Amino acid sequence: MEDRRPHLEARPRNPPANHRGPMDGELPPRARNQTNNPAATNHAGRHLRASNHPAPFRQREERFRAMGRNPHQGRRNQEGHTSDEARDQRQSQNDTRRRNDDQEGRSHRPPWSSDTFQQWHTPPQKPGEQPQQTKRLGYKFLESLLQKEPSEVAITLATSLGLKELLSHSSMKPSFLQLICQVLRKACSSRIDRQSILHVLGILNNSKFLRVCLPAYVVGMITEPSPDIRNQYPEHISNIISLLQDLVSVFPASSMQETSMLISLLPTSLNALRASGVDIEEETEKNLEKVQAIIKYLQEKRRQGSLRVDTYTLVQAEAEGEVESYRAMPIYPTYNEVHLDEKPFLRPNIISGKYESTAVYLDTHFRLLREDFVRPLREGILKLLQSFEDQCLRKRKFDDIRIYFDARIITPMCSASGIVYKVQFDTKPLKLVRWQNSKRLLYGSLVCMSKDNFETFLFATVSNREHEDLCQGIVQLCFNEQSQQLLADVQPSDSFLMVETTAYFEAYRHVLEGLQEVQEEDVPFQRNIVQCDSYVRNPRYLLMGGRYDFTPLMENPSAMRKSLRGAEALRHPRINVFDFGQWPSKEALKLDDSQMEALQFALTKELAIIQGPPGTGKTYVGLKIVQALLTNKSVWQINTQTFPILVVCYTNHALDQFLEGIYGCQKTSIVRVGGRSNSEILKQFTLRELRNKREFRRTLPMHLRRAYMSIVTEMKESEQKLQEGAQTLECTMHGVLREQHLEKYISAQHWESLMSGPVQDADWVCVQPSKHSMILEWLGLGVGSFTQSASPAGPENTAQAEGEEEEEGEEEGSLIEIAEEADLIQADRVIEEEEVVRPRRRKKEENGTDQELAKMLLAMRLDQEVPGTTAGPEQATEEWETQRGQKKKMKRRVKVELRKLNTMTKAEANGIQDVWQLDLSSRWQLYRLWLQMYQADTRRRILSYERQYRTWAERMAELRLQEDLHILKDAEVVGMTTTGAAKYRQILQQVEPRIVIVEEAAEVLEAHTIATLSKACQHLILIGDHQQLRPSANVYDLAKNFNLEVSLFERLVKVNIPFVRLNYQHRMRPEIARLLTPHIYQDLENHPSVLKYEQIKGVSSNLFFVEHNFPEQEIQEGKSHQNQHEAHFVVELCQYLLCQEYLPSQITILTTYTGQLFCLRKLMPVKTFAGIKVHVVDKYQGEENDIILLSLVRSNQEGKVGFLQIPNRICVALSRAKKGMYCIGNMQMLAKVPLWSRIIHTLRENNQIGPSLRLCCQNHPETHTLVSKASDFQKVPEGGCSRPCEFRLACGHVCTRACHPYDSSHKEFQCMKPCQKVLCQDGHRCPNVCFQECQPCQVKVPKIILKCGHKQMVPCSMSESEFCCQEPCSKILRCGHRCSHLCGEDCVRLCSERVTVELKCGHSQLVKCGNVEDIKYGLPVKCTTKCDTTLDCGHPCPGSCHSCFEGRFHERCQQPCKRLLICSHKCQEPCTGECPPCQRTCQNRCVHSQCKKKCGELCSPCVEPCVWRCQHYQCTKLCSEPCNRPPCYVPCTKLLACGHPCIGLCGEPCPKKCRVCQPDEVTQIFFGFEDEPDARFVQLEDCSHIFEVQALDRFMNEQKDDEVAIKLKVCPICQVPIRKNLRYGTSIKQRLEEIEIVKEKIQGSAGEISTSQEQLKALLKSKTLFHQLRPEEFLILQEKLAQKNLSVKDLGLVENSIRFYDHLANLEGSLEKVHCGEQQSVRTRLEQVHEWLAKKRLSFSSQELSDLQSEIQRLTYLVNLLMRCKMAEKVKGSIAEEVSSIRNILEKTSKFTQEDEQLVQKKMDALKTTLPCSGLGISDEERVQIVTAMGVPRGHWFKCPNGHIYVITECGGAMQRSTCPECQEVIGGENHTLERSNHLASEMDGAQHPAWSNTANNFMNFEEIHRMM
């Protein structure tokens, strides 16, 4: 969490942006030497300098430097205030925070909320996780922290919510205070958790613990009587001093008062303790003196006024003439370096002797490395400053830097690593840049931005690079810490000059910081590296001896056993590693002599250097070394701790190769740290993958998991608030703001002037301003708006800067894929876990939010087709009748104006009375002033959220490092790129790898290698070749004259440190190796395997150099070169070699320049060249292939060969081929280089160079073809020669191609001639092309079909029996119809003839004859007869008999309703009894906005101020409230465009008609007063009709007595509703208010709806049977009731559904009492009702309710009847007939009418007595009489299997069997057990169980028990 002191308005001017200061991931030293800088000034680009700074600060700095902490991070809130003032404001903020904690919806506060950020927000808990500590930290808990690592203590305290509460107490026990000090000191000793420590110290700095408890404790020491306690005080005093030293270093300004008070008390306490005999350690007194010196120094600075903020840097003065210590040097360039051409102090890298000391060694490499990236920037800026007066500055090029003009810092953005900023620059000077390949603005590049000629400047690095954005001039930058502090005062309108240096700054930064942090004594191998002692010791871990097992390294382990002697072989395979005689043979290890020597050397020397010329197996030997070490890890590991092997490679590709080799012998415990891996095998070992594994997340310590949850929650909250404000800020750059958002920043006089419009002036024409934003009219952006007749001055009307850039042509998608150079470089730059910083938001969501925000804020948007208008869509065309070109021009003008820098000053603005009198240029200047104030205010509001998010992101980065530390500590092999090793140097210090292997060591700068090593390193193995590529340096002077390009590998070789060189090359055939030996390597022997290579096919020589003198072309951007002649030749040669049947994977094209790379790509379509690799030479070191085609590119009259003169590059280029190499270049020019001259001489001696390459045809060896240019390859079009192939194909034809070496057997050749084969006896020939397979003859011939005798045309190859006769079948089916199939087919089973049948519903319908029988047996048929029943609404039913369920459930009426709704729209829904709310877009609008809701929803009232004003009256109400001013009747004084007076009124929109020009239209009589000469008119805005004002006033204000409908007034002419007119606003608003009341009634009040919703929920819950039988429907209704925003209509639908479903459920439940045979038919009818009820509907129409009620009533009667009829078989005669007649009515398919119901009811009443519900065949009265007469309790009545009733007396339990007198079945039972076939007759007495049963014995029939008692 961030320090929570207030963010005050005062901005620090120091420390400056160019201060060395901390970068992300480090804390700078407190003591800095700034001797080069002048005294402190107010320039933000300069340093404070402290003179006479006391010396003791240096030692204290060492601990902070080693820790990598930045004491100034997060302390941005003490600016310009004393501690007392800060404390007061903190208290005020804490009060505010407590108030805010009680408020809900905190996350919805806008980003400009002034409330203090809620620091103590508790993150949500996951199930099963322990809750965060929210109570005071207890003694036991603090004691437990003392047992933990410092890192865990720091993170736990920073995450704990109880720390602040703990330190807020004003008194505590001494023992508790002492424990707190111990814990705090331990937390501050952590080396990698700087942000957590800063947070803890921030809480301590603002606590009563510091202000009250500690002083009281120190004073109490003086009077302590107990000797034992006094003797403990020195230790606690040491803790307090250490804490104070940390505190004053981090918060020098805000903590000084409390710290100085404590420091003044401590000497007195120490003297008192000393006087009482307590020993005080000398170190304690020294530390106290250091802090006293710091306090004294700070007090002096405070008196001078220079100590105002916590970002003040403590600096140390050096003795006069002393060289500035490199540890105090800033990494970034300083003000003096940029403005004064001072030569820095540099020492060359010593390559021929030893260094004076380790300090000098580190100093030398630090200065050289820093100068390598600073010098280009420094010299570039100096040249730029000298060129400022140059008129062609934008076109001028600078060698050292790239310049970007008019860069604007637009808005902050949240990323995973912190805050980044979107920066936009001018792309016009960069039209020719190909951003996909350009090295401009690559990830990690450093940029310097200034807006005042570099008097002050900001530093940033590129954090994200998308070439699509770069084309628009947009890049994301991450500013360094000092620059972040200055960003508070930067506005989006500020224009910067941005300068880029090409160096990968992030790599420099990490290494430079590492060199500053490392202590001299911690540099390993100093005796060899610094003192250059040639004696190399054995590794320390082998001092006690070491026995190694080499068995896994051997292909045949038995050889190992043979090589050991006697008993030794029997005991174990381990041997003494120092006794080379015991080692396995080189043959057993598969090594040559030099490789064997290298392996022995590497395993026995602590510093092993292995040089491997090309092809000698460097990587192979390196893997053998790693395998040996891993196999014998017990020798160099400690049992209690794991130390991984660290493998460092220069490139990602080399790292992948090496780790894949290790994977062959080690499948687990590998970790890869570097750029994105292209290896599928290694992806599982990347940090990202390992970190995301579930098992790893589970094993993370709890304190890290808690911290992660807390920080993620806070990050999300800060991000949300920041994004809202940032989007607002960005919107201001994309259009013109609406005036209401600027009102706060416009003076009252200017606002009134702006909104009133211009006074009468002949130069103005009139429009209707109410339709548009007034500010658009004022800025000249309205089309029919106030437009000055005179053209404005300035570039507004010119085409300057308005031309649109032409888009570059698209790349062809059919070309081979070549990684863009920018991508290649970036891939090596980006550490995988660092990743390119991308905004956290998804673009889709971002765009949606931005669009909504822009719509609200902007009156005109640059990304919109039509400028913003508040008018409805109907008026859009009429209002903006501008041509497309004019709109485009208008947008360009706005774009230009928004990017202009000239702004009106406030003083100038105050002198303006009428803003409409300004010319257009001045208006834009004034607008930019208002805009700047708006932007500044918005920027100020989001600043605190930036700081909060940045702090949380830094805390999160620390947590990630802790996670990574856990991963790396568990690994056995850690692979890193050099950049990754520098970045993770602090973790490597913790991991402490004992063995470090550096691959490609000769390519790595020495400083990079040293920064990789930790003091724990005991074994360093360097593998490389200094005669190939050297390390690359930016500055040529430093590389050559200061030996910066000499790697540690090369330097150690040159100072005679022992090394082993691999002597046998296993790659190149001898002819190719001859180019390297002896020209580059004196003695490089060929391994026998390279003597067995086959000759290259199709070429007379395996090695050849083609000479030419065709000139190169220089590529403007990128300083690269290309040679079209060479590119065409190489591509043609490549295609020729493919024709020789070489695989694409066997050929690689190399070139020396990137420009040539993309020239080649354009010539290589993927169809032909898929799989061919194309690379630049530098990216191909370490690689090899069978055939290499090399293009050297350079060819010019000046003889410039560029880096082709560098031996190392020549070595790499000539050593990549295994079997064949073909090179093309200007050899005459290259021969001027001595090395090339010698190589060319060797080539000439062997006839391997010449102007033409001799091709040799494989098929005709005597035929040779000379090729010197691409067109010559046309002589060998198919890769052979020009002779025809003449091969006779299997088909008998001749091959039509030219001679071709591929496909010699012609198996793949496709002969395209017509096939001539005879297919049948009739002589028919094959119609196919020759290569196609012949098919059976398909020529049709007449044949007689044997089965039927018909004559048919049958394919020649088909027999008569197989052919299906195509004649119609003549057979007659059983139904009498003819068979419809063909003669050859089986006859149809079901006749398809259509016949008419009568359906069950009574209708006739055509059906298939074959289905008639099935229909008789119940097959359902959908009757399509139209229903045509007249519905309740009067319209005919649109359904069919089937869809209307045979008239029982009619379909909804589909006729249009056409009724007029209250909103004046016609109902769009089909005919219903009750119209639903209108679903069209609401048409209500005002001058400010338009309602976007549905018309039937309640409108949100406009709360903007009412704009109805004129010179005489002004309304002061809100827009939605009734106006409080009268209408004005003063005639309008404006002139129309025609020059005649306006016929309108003051303050009203001027009517478009003229009394003079259109007299007929104006004076046309409507109300009767239009022809009067003084008549005044009003134009309705909704329809544009004009009316005489007095008549229209009466019309609008009259209220007819007989008018009962609530509706809007309409235009008397066209009946369009009058919705928008300021003059009649009160009347319109009154009508709208009435309409809103009606809407609310329709929708229902929220309270009523909520109550009804709860009641329905309770009702639904009570319907248990419904839930049980119909769970799906129950759940649907339950979910519906859980929804929000339900209307009354919705609830009505749900209520009806519940009641209907409940009734149906009851009916379904009653079916148990119905005979089984009858249940299915009823269930079918119930399912039909359910099916119909489940249809989607907004409500039930009256017709639907009627149908549903009728059907449910029918089913209720039917179920009741069937229940009565369960025993109906006993009912005889007339009763059975009566039952049958009732069932006929109830089971018919037509609707159950009212008459049916009356008849059924009457018949059912008659049956009650004869057919009771009991089913006993007796009436209920008779049943009651029988039960009463027997006098037995419930549960005594039973029935036999056939349902005959009998009674068991006494206890009710069956004690004997008998027979039923009716049916002779067994009744009764024995031993109180009833016969299984008998059952309880509950219908007699309602009993639920027998009287004698377990249930009865436990519970009995409760009513019976009650009666018996």
From Swiss-Prot:
<dbReference type="GO" id="GO:0005741">
    <property type="term" value="C:mitochondrial outer membrane"/>
</dbReference>
<keyword id="KW-0479">Metal-binding</keyword>
<keyword id="KW-0391">Immunity</keyword>
<keyword id="KW-0677">Repeat</keyword>
<dbReference type="InterPro" id="IPR045055">
    <property type="entry name" value="DNA2/NAM7-like"/>
</dbReference>
<comment type="function">
    <text>RNA-binding protein that initiates the antiviral response and is required to restrict the replication of RNA viruses. Acts as a double-stranded RNA (dsRNA) sensor that recognizes viral RNA and then interacts with MAVS to initiate the type I interferon response. Also required for immunity against some bacteria, such as mycobacteria.</text>
</comment>
<keyword id="KW-1000">Mitochondrion outer membrane</keyword>
<dbReference type="GO" id="GO:0010494">
    <property type="term" value="C:cytoplasmic stress granule"/>
</dbReference>
<feature type="binding site">
    <location>
        <position position="1840"/>
    </location>
    <ligand>
        <name>Zn(2+)</name>
    </ligand>
</feature>
<dbReference type="GO" id="GO:0002218">
    <property type="term" value="P:activation of innate immune response"/>
</dbReference>
<feature type="compositionally biased region" description="Acidic residues">
    <location>
        <begin position="802"/>
        <end position="813"/>
    </location>
</feature>
<feature type="region of interest" description="Disordered">
    <location>
        <begin position="1"/>
        <end position="133"/>
    </location>
</feature>
<feature type="compositionally biased region" description="Basic and acidic residues">
    <location>
        <begin position="76"/>
        <end position="107"/>
    </location>
</feature>
<dbReference type="GO" id="GO:0045087">
    <property type="term" value="P:innate immune response"/>
</dbReference>
<dbReference type="Pfam" id="PF20173">
    <property type="entry name" value="ZnF_RZ-type"/>
</dbReference>
<protein>
    <recommendedName>
        <fullName>NFX1-type zinc finger-containing protein 1</fullName>
    </recommendedName>
</protein>
<keyword id="KW-0694">RNA-binding</keyword>
<comment type="subunit">
    <text>Interacts with MAVS.</text>
</comment>
<keyword id="KW-0863">Zinc-finger</keyword>
<feature type="zinc finger region" description="NF-X1-type 3">
    <location>
        <begin position="1433"/>
        <end position="1455"/>
    </location>
</feature>
<feature type="compositionally biased region" description="Polar residues">
    <location>
        <begin position="113"/>
        <end position="122"/>
    </location>
</feature>
<feature type="compositionally biased region" description="Basic and acidic residues">
    <location>
        <begin position="1"/>
        <end position="12"/>
    </location>
</feature>
<keyword id="KW-0399">Innate immunity</keyword>
<feature type="region of interest" description="Disordered">
    <location>
        <begin position="787"/>
        <end position="813"/>
    </location>
</feature>
<dbReference type="InterPro" id="IPR046439">
    <property type="entry name" value="ZF_RZ_dom"/>
</dbReference>
<feature type="binding site">
    <location>
        <position position="1860"/>
    </location>
    <ligand>
        <name>Zn(2+)</name>
    </ligand>
</feature>
<feature type="coiled-coil region">
    <location>
        <begin position="1733"/>
        <end position="1764"/>
    </location>
</feature>
<dbReference type="InterPro" id="IPR041679">
    <property type="entry name" value="DNA2/NAM7-like_C"/>
</dbReference>
<dbReference type="GO" id="GO:0008270">
    <property type="term" value="F:zinc ion binding"/>
</dbReference>
<dbReference type="Pfam" id="PF13086">
    <property type="entry name" value="AAA_11"/>
</dbReference>
<dbReference type="GO" id="GO:0003723">
    <property type="term" value="F:RNA binding"/>
</dbReference>
<feature type="coiled-coil region">
    <location>
        <begin position="939"/>
        <end position="964"/>
    </location>
</feature>
<dbReference type="InterPro" id="IPR041677">
    <property type="entry name" value="DNA2/NAM7_AAA_11"/>
</dbReference>
<keyword id="KW-0175">Coiled coil</keyword>
<dbReference type="InterPro" id="IPR047187">
    <property type="entry name" value="SF1_C_Upf1"/>
</dbReference>
<keyword id="KW-0862">Zinc</keyword>
<feature type="zinc finger region" description="NF-X1-type 1">
    <location>
        <begin position="1291"/>
        <end position="1313"/>
    </location>
</feature>
<dbReference type="InterPro" id="IPR027417">
    <property type="entry name" value="P-loop_NTPase"/>
</dbReference>
<keyword id="KW-0472">Membrane</keyword>
<feature type="zinc finger region" description="NF-X1-type 4">
    <location>
        <begin position="1463"/>
        <end position="1480"/>
    </location>
</feature>
<feature type="binding site">
    <location>
        <position position="1844"/>
    </location>
    <ligand>
        <name>Zn(2+)</name>
    </ligand>
</feature>
<keyword id="KW-0963">Cytoplasm</keyword>
